[in-house]
């Protein structure tokens, strides 16, 4: 049984709602935005809301209160509660002082340190508190002074890519003043990351032309990856054609490829909607068909996430609509998984292969059922079926869609799949039926009852001679359910 269970865990993608926690108001950001009083917090806590519980993303009350600028006295009260120790690990391995630094909350940072918060912690992405603050755009020199006092090192504290605080904060700078400050604390205009990228490349991500001009005046070199960095932009701010033309005017190479095999259009194609920008780069010889080290092209990225207008525009330049990335995913697969029905329909209209399979043997139907809960599902299904999609083909490891839906514990999906003539008793590579998988993984007997109602055989055994009843008996999620009907 244990062997089978491990196989299942390694082969199936489970929907997080399967293990969904009971709703906790302390995990709702709007609750903290209202700056609730301690009295209100106590009332909510008395009603069963857990003040120290981490949610599925490892955020808790203290983190959300910090992120939403709740009064510091309230946050201090939360910290006094059992389970909210100052060095508690939260999302991405960050303790509370990381989030205080992220919000430029120096008062809270000092309070946490007074309560023995550690300042030498490195998060799951390789960031110290200093570098996390810099990478999120913090420019308060008083906070940096304090972190230096707490033994942070401006010169040598680096992330996994070898970038120090000067490089990490560069994209967010409005002027040269913080650069001067960091230089006075030990940084250098010659500082580079592990790939030889310096402050000019990092500043190019932010697209501040005035700052870039100042750096040029200071004699800073314009690295070969500058246009790549500029094309990436920031999460909430993307660069414009003006920035790209400026960089070209000062000698930055436009048609460049980085160590990951990407050109500037790889990043731009995800969400830039300015046709003039695409025309500019294409006119400079930047290739929309270039596949990076993971096999993805700018066109694939557009099909994954951009508008129909951009996809149509770039499609005029592609050489093979059915090119695949290293995981065997075509532009059509990506559009089914992540884009809208109009892009799916367009790609099919220009020759995208309806029978495409990824490297694991999954067809388009696999990607379609993974968006079952979205409003796009039925529309995409209709388009794909009209173009010849067969829904009862086997997927990876000889799984049917019923196997996958059972592993996801998704009764609604199982019912929707019933019309596609899928053999409910088919066995996958591990010689398991959908019912056997459900018996091991479901949290409700309703799925078991449904599978039996559509013809699933219950008098079958695993390779370890275990019956359906045996499997369900070992399922902790069913320990309070009556499963005698499986005998």
Show the residue positions of the predicted features.
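Solenoidal tandem-repeat scaffolds enriched in leucines and small polar residues
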Residues: 137-266, 271-274
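Ankyrin-repeat boundary/"N-cap" motif
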Residues: 22-32, 53-66, 88-98, 122-134, ...
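Bacterial Sec-dependent N-terminal signal peptides
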Residues: 1-26, 480-481, 487
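N-terminal leader/linker segments that initiate helical-solenoid repeat arrays
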Residues: 18-83, 88-91, 473-474, 487
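Ankyrin repeat A-helix N-terminal signature
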Residues: 34-35, 64-71, 99-105, 132-140, ...
